[in-house]
């Protein structure tokens, strides 16, 4: 599998460890940087990973910053990207199976390297399980990437709220 990986200067060493791990598992890696500890800005590298995945150059992506929050938000701004900030295998698997996430984000100063590798393995092994319901949710989420009058409609999510009221969703 070809995986794009990017980080900011705070977690360069953590990213290098992830790149080395992925290569040791037989994956091809597109290292989108950064490559040193010189101060930089996480949106640059979130965008690079997102563009690599959205264009098809990479199949999936991994982004890392100190907390994971900034770079995961940045990569989610790239059209075609569905990224999840994860700290456990359950969330990573859910993001892939139910939401068809194509990028996962980590807080490199929050989570240990061995756990990060385990979570990445779980994410890569998981497969999207399309259902009519999650297809609709993904379509609705993807529509938010493009400004439209529908988003200003206070009833934008009514079809889903009505199903909730009818008891069609189960936790």
Curated annotation (Swiss-Prot):
Molecular function GO labels: galactose-6-phosphate isomerase activity; ribose-5-phosphate isomerase activity
Family annotation (InterPro entries): LacB, RpiB_LacA_LacB, RpiB_LacA_LacB_sf
One of the protein's GO biological processes: galactose catabolic process
Enzyme Commission designation: 5.3.1.26
Pathway(s) it belongs to: Carbohydrate metabolism; D-galactose 6-phosphate degradation; D-tagatose 6-phosphate from D-galactose 6-phosphate: step 1/1
Domain of life: Bacteria
Protein keywords: Isomerase, Lactose metabolism
Family: Belongs to the LacAB/RpiB family.
Subunit record text: Heteromultimeric protein consisting of LacA and LacB.
Entry-linked NCBIfam families: PRK05571.1, PRK08622.1, rpiB_lacA_lacB
Protein name according to UniProt: Galactose-6-phosphate isomerase subunit LacB 2
């Amino acid at each position: 599998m070809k995986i794009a990986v990017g980080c900011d200067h705070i977690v360069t060493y953590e990213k290098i460890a992830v790149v080395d791990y992925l290569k040791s598992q037989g994956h091809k890696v597109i290292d989108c940087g950064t490559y040193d500890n010189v101060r930089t800005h996480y949106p640059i590298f979130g965008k690079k990973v997102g563009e690599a995945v959205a264009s098809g150059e990479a199949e999936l992506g991994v982004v890392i910053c100190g907390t994971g929050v900034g770079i995961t938000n940045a990569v989610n701004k790239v059209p075609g990207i569905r990224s999840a900030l994860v700290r456990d295998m359950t969330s990573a698997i859910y993001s892939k199976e139910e939401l068809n996430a194509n990028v996962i984000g980590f807080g490199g100063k929050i989570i240990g390297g061995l756990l990060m590798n385990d979570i990445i393995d779980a994410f890569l092994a998981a497969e999207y399980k399309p259902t009519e319901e999650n297809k609709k949710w993904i379509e609705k989420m993807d529509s938010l990437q493009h400004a439209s009058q529908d988003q200003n409609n206070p009833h934008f999510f009514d079809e889903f709220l009505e199903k909730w009221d009818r008891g069609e969703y189960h936790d």
